[in-house]
C-alpha cells in the first residue's frame, strides 16, 4: 500500500485509502484487552481493530512481506459474500460498517469525526463500485473517491457503463480463454 516503511498517522489509519493485510498488523495487546461492543457487533474484525488502536496514536507501516495470506478459502467471509444476493450482502455490509464507524466516532469523543465521515463516504462509494451502481459511481458527490481508484478500475467502469454490450462480450471471451 505504501512504497516505503513509514509512520502512518491515526487519521490515516481511520480514513485509509489503501489496504494492508490484517495478518501484517502488530498491535499492543493492552489495546485489545477491553474491546467495545461495536467490535463484537461488526461482521469483520480487521477494520475495528485498526481504528481502535488508532485512538492511542499513530501506526508504523513496515514495507516488507510480514505474513502469508491464504486466498480463495471457500469458508472465508469474503468468499461468502459472493453467494446468494450479492447486492443485499453489500448493502448489509455497508450498514454494519457504518454503525461501527458511528459507534467508534462516539467512543473516541469525535476526535476523528471528519476522518470517520470520509471513511464512511468512501465505503459507501466502494459498495456502489462493487455492485456496479453507475449512477452513484459517476455522480459528482463521489468525484474525489472516484479519482482515488486506479486507472485500470476507472477504465473498466467507464467501458462497462458506456459500452455494456462490448464489455460483456470482451469479458465473456476473456473468461473463456482463462479456462
Residue ranges, per PLM feature:
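Acidic helix/loop microenvironments that form the catalytic cleft of cell-wall polysaccharide enzymes
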Residues: 118-124
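Short, conserved alpha-helical segments within structured domains
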Residues: 45-46, 115, 162
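Soluble or luminal CAZymes and related metallo-dependent hydrolases
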Residues: 5, 42-45, 85-96, 118
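Short secondary-structure boundary segments
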Residues: 1-14, 116, 169-178
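Conserved nucleotide-sugar donor-binding catalytic segment
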Residues: 1-83
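Catalytic core of nucleotide-sugar-dependent glycosyltransferases
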Residues: 67-73, 79-110, 134-146
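Short, charged, amphipathic alpha-helical segments
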Residues: 111-118
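Membrane-interface aromatic/basic loop that binds lipid-linked glycans or pyrophosphate carriers
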Residues: 124-179
Amino acid at each position: 500500500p505504501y512504497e516505503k516503511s513509514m509512520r502512518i498517522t491515526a487519521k490515516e489509519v481511520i480514513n485509509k485509502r489503501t489496504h494492508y493485510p490484517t495478518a501484517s498488523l502488530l498491535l499492543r495487546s493492552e489495546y485489545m484487552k477491553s474491546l467495545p461492543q461495536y467490535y463484537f457487533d461488526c461482521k469483520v474484525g480487521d477494520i475495528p481493530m485498526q481504528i481502535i488502536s488508532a485512538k492511542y496514536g499513530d501506526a508504523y507501516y513496515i514495507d516488507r512481506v510480514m505474513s502469508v495470506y491464504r486466498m480463495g478459502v471457500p469458508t472465508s467471509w469474503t468468499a461468502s459474500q459472493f453467494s446468494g444476493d450479492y447486492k443485499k450482502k453489500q448493502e448489509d455490509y455497508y450498514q454494519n460498517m457504518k454503525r461501527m464507524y458511528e459507534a467508534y466516532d462516539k467512543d473516541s469523543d469525535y476526535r476523528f469525526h471528519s476522518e470517520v465521515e470520509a471513511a464512511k463516504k468512501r465505503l459507501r462509494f466502494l459498495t456502489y463500485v462493487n455492485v456496479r451502481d453507475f449512477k452513484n459511481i459517476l455522480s459528482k458527490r463521489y468525484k474525489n473517491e472516484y479519482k482515488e481508484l486506479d486507472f485500470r478500475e476507472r477504465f473498466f467502469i467507464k467501458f462497462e457503463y458506456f459500452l455494456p454490450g462490448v464489455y460483456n462480450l470482451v469479458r465473456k471471451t476473456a473468461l473463456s480463454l482463462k479456462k
